Amino acid sequence: MPFSLVWTDTFKRTAKKFLKKHRDLADTFSLVLHKLENDPHDPELRLHALSGKHLGKHAVSLTYSYRIVLRLVLTDTGIFLLDVGTHDEVYR
């Protein structure tokens, strides 16, 4: 069963800036979102729970250097996209 991706306003702005700066990652970005929508537990996504001040959130790898932070709501089959950027940017 596919999950619905919910683009928060913050994520929309961040993704737009990110893709403008990293045009070479546009295809990878789309592929990761497609995989996330179909199976968030796909091993290639490297989904992992966050801790500390990000408790309750998860992250998936876009590349080795870049992450997408999200809130996974499995009861409603919703995935709330929160942030995208480098490791340091998204975990600030």
Predicted segments, located by residue:
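Enriched for short, Lys/Arg-rich terminal
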Residues: 2-4, 13-17, 23-26, 62-92
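Residues that recognize and position ribonucleotide moieties
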Residues: 4-5, 43
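Short alpha-helical scaffold segments that flank and stabilize functional sites
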Residues: 17-18, 35
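PIN-domain endoribonuclease scaffold, especially VapC-family toxins
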Residues: 26-34
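Short alpha-helical linear motifs
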Residues: 31, 52-55, 70-75
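A short, surface-exposed loop/turn module that caps and links secondary-structure elements
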Residues: 34-60
